[in-house]
């Protein structure tokens, strides 16, 4: 499906749900109240593994899953678990840095988080983006435009890095989101997933992890929205297993 068709589908879908928009707003507020707000994980930097060569550098940047909501420390969250997996693959130490913030979209990642990135070159960059572009109803055109800009910034500043991108959220599996808001957001998440698959295809050393079909969601959730420590471990392992097929470590 072309970008224009996705955009048209998004606009028509918005028009269709407009009559129940007040109900959806109330439903969303109630769900947010039920979920509450988890704290960020502690210790956003670390080193894992060992090897004869100097440590490689991994940057993990993005939304609440990058901030580690649902885990006690980043070592047990997405950043640390991804670094552990990379270290095992390259048989070398990985120096990892996490920059995450709850609620950020791709645009806010550019504006608010990228200025915080250390002035150094990274060998690997993992973008944990997409959940809030779904939750905050970014259109397909906005999603593509902002992600292409973010990928371009990463590439311009880290020309030799491999860029990995986590999947758009698996909202359909969330045990806390009620219908009809779950179905509406899931349809948008699937649309953003297909969109990013299309526009990253053929990009040099840019790898997107499509919405998975092989993740066991038993014990995955901390609060119904964010992963638990087990969820982060399983998620990172599944992503890296997918990247193994497309990236030569």
Specify the residue positions occupied by each region the protein language model found:
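Short, flexible coil/linker segments at domain boundaries that flank nucleotide/cofactor-interacting
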Residues: 51-53, 91, 158
């Amino acid at each position: 499906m072309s970008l224009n068709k996705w955009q048209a589908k998004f606009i028509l879908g918005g028009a269709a749900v407009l009559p129940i928009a007040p109900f959806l707003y109330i439903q969303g507020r109630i769900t947010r109240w039920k979920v509450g707000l988890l704290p960020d994980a502690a210790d956003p930097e670390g080193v894992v593994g060992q090897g004869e060569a100097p440590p490689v550098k991994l940057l993990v940047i993005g939304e609440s899953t990058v901030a580690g909501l649902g885990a006690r420390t980043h070592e047990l969250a997405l950043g640390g678990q991804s670094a552990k997996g990379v270290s095992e693959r390259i048989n070398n130490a990985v120096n990892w840095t996490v920059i995450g913030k709850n609620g950020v979209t791709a645009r806010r990642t550019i504006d608010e988080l990228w200025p915080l990135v250390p002035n150094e070159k990274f060998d690997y960059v993992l973008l944990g983006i997409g959940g809030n572009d779904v939750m905050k109803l970014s259109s397909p055109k906005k999603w593509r435009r902002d992600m292409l800009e973010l990928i371009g910034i990463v590439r311009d500043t880290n020309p030799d890095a491999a860029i990995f991108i986590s999947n758009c959220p698996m909202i359909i599996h969330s045990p806390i989101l009620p219908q009809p808001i779950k179905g509406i957001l899931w349809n948008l998440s699937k649309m953003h997933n297909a969109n990013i698959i299309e526009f990253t295809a053929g990009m040099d050393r840019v790898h997107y992890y499509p919405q998975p079909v092989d993740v066991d969601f038993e014990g995955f959730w901390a609060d119904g929205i964010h992963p638990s420590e087990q969820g982060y471990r399983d998620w990172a392992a599944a992503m890296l297993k997918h990247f193994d097929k497309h990236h030569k470590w």
